[in-house]
């Protein structure tokens, strides 16, 4: 019955910003999720790209706005403004590149500087299809996630491994249901605010 009530509510939008060093696979993860495809030709993201997708969960439907940021240093100054109003940050590293893993601490710090501690952060070790070239163990990823109090998953955008699971876990952590209920409460308060304004008039005048 509560699901039926949700149909009247506008589709909730959540902004997810993808962060990480250059060539860790941010764009590839988004492309795999959006189109279930993978492009072997590497093209660096210039500035910021934006894509949007509706996601159907068990108890609600939401719209994810995916912001793909460039990893290059020259675009770094653009990123804080995109982090500022995000609901979640996906911080990606390449399991075959230990430097990209070390840099995730800085990216997570940037997110918390702009958004405070209430933002959802997912640490993602990408490129598990290159396991023979692995420089960062899954245990190291899990340890860092625990230390920094963030979520963690390993993925392969190329093989499609855990990509849907990544987005499902982030979506499940979003404050969708609470926000929807708060919205309804706000609407109810708005209605109540109009009634008290009428009451003093009827009490002060004739009781019609």
Swiss-Prot record:
A motif (Switch 1) lies at residues 32-50. Its cofactor is Mg(2+). It catalyses: GTP + H2O = GDP + phosphate + H(+). Keywords: Acetylation, ER-Golgi transport, Golgi apparatus, GTP-binding, Hydrolase, Lipoprotein, Magnesium, Membrane, Metal-binding, Methylation, Nucleotide-binding, Prenylation, Protein transport, Transport. The modification Cysteine methyl ester is found at residue 208. SUPFAM superfamilies: P-loop containing nucleoside triphosphate hydrolases. InterPro entries: P-loop_NTPase, Rab, Small_GTP-bd, Small_GTPase. Switch 1, switch 2 and the interswitch regions are characteristic of Rab GTPases and mediate the interactions with Rab downstream effectors. The switch regions undergo conformational changes upon nucleotide binding which drives interaction with specific sets of effector proteins, with most effectors only binding to GTP-bound Rab. SMART domains: RAB (SM00175), RAN (SM00176), RAS (SM00173), RHO (SM00174). This is Ras-related protein Rab-6A. GTP binds at residues 23-28, 39-40, 42, 45, 71, 126-127, 129, 156-158. The keyword Transcription does not apply. It is an enzyme of class 3 (hydrolase). It is a lipid-anchor. CDD domains: Rab6. The small GTPases Rab are key regulators of intracellular membrane trafficking, from the formation of transport vesicles to their fusion with membranes. Rabs cycle between an inactive GDP-bound form and an active GTP-bound form that is able to recruit to membranes different sets of downstream effectors directly responsible for vesicle formation, movement, tethering and fusion. RAB6A acts as a regulator of COPI-independent retrograde transport from the Golgi apparatus towards the endoplasmic reticulum (ER). Regulated by guanine nucleotide exchange factors (GEFs) which promote the exchange of bound GDP for free GTP. Regulated by GTPase activating proteins (GAPs) which increase the GTP hydrolysis activity. Inhibited by GDP dissociation inhibitors (GDIs). It comes from Gallus gallus. Its EC number is 3.6.5.2. PROSITE patterns: RAB. Belongs to the small GTPase superfamily. Rab family. The modification N-acetylserine is found at residue 2. It comes from the Eukaryota.
